[in-house]
């Protein structure tokens, strides 16, 4: 079994694309395939000691799911399935996609929601990211002046995505016992 579980929720496929680009940097012994949370069980998810989780922020700051007009279930429906799990001793890194120009008042709020969910259940959250280079009004994903995970804006800053992903993975690798 792979050491790191890589899971995402997606509506348009952008978060899936980023998850797959993360996976390409690791072999199968190190990281699972990029797995959509609408296709896994709580047991699949819970078996990993290390997790990398991705989400877009939809509409007015929502997680993807049926109530935010997604065609398929996503994080909104998956989180209740794992809310009884204890994540103490697990290390979690988060990445989020959002549109800082179109939705500056709730940029990456869904990332903040994932952060709170896993932190409240004992997970060690790693991979905070600087807010430098972003222009937004507010975000639930900012704690102590930094994003709680990798912040990506494929709508307005797609040219920075590969560089940001590489730098973030280098930052979190030691937390997962890896070297890049």
From Swiss-Prot:
GO terms for molecular function: electron transfer activity; FMN binding; oxidoreductase activity, acting on NAD(P)H, quinone or similar compound as acceptor. This is Flavodoxin 2. Residues 4-173 form the Flavodoxin-like domain. It comes from Azotobacter vinelandii. It comes from the Bacteria. NCBIfam families: flav_long (TIGR01752), PRK09267.1-4 (NF006738), PRK09267.1-5 (NF006739). Its cofactor is FMN. Transmembrane segments: none annotated. InterPro entries: Flavdoxin-like, Flavodoxin, Flavodoxin/NO_synth, Flavodoxin_CS, Flavodoxin_lc, Flavoprotein-like_sf. Flavodoxins are low-potential electron donors to a number of redox enzymes. NifF is the electron donor to nitrogenase, and is thus implicated in nitrogen fixation. Does not function as an electron donor to nitrite reductase. The keyword Translocase does not apply. PANTHER family: FLAVODOXIN 1, FLAVODOXIN 2. One of its GO terms (biological process) is nitrogen fixation. The lineage of its organism: Bacteria, Pseudomonadati, Pseudomonadota, Gammaproteobacteria, Pseudomonadales. Keywords: Electron transport, Flavoprotein, FMN, Nitrogen fixation, Transport. Belongs to the flavodoxin family. Induction: Is the predominant flavodoxin expressed when A.vinelandii is grown on N(2) as nitrogen source. Is also synthesized during growth on nitrate, but in less abundance than AvFld 1. FMN binds at residues 10-15, 57, 61, 99, 106-108, 155.
């Amino acid at each position: 079994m792979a050491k790191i579980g890589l899971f995402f929720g997606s509506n348009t496929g952008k978060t899936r694309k980023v998850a797959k680009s993360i996976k390409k940097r690791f072999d199968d012994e190190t990281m699972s395939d990029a797995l959509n949370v609408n296709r896994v069980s709580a047991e699949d998810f819970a078996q990993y000691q290390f997790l990398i989780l991705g989400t877009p922020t939809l509409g007015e700051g929502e997680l993807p799911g049926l109530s935010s007009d997604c065609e398929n279930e996503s994080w909104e429906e998956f989180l209740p399935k794992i809310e009884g799990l204890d994540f103490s001793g697990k290390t979690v890194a988060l990445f989020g996609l959002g549109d800082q120009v179109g939705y500056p008042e709730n940029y990456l709020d869904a990332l903040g929601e994932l952060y709170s969910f896993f932190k409240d259940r004992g997970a060690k959250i790693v991979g905070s990211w600087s807010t430098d280079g972003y222009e937004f009004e507010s975000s639930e994903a900012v704690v102590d002046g930094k994003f709680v995970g990798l912040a990506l804006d494929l709508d307005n800053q797609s040219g920075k995505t590969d560089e940001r992903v590489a730098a973030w993975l280098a930052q979190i690798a030691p937390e997962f016992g890896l070297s890049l």
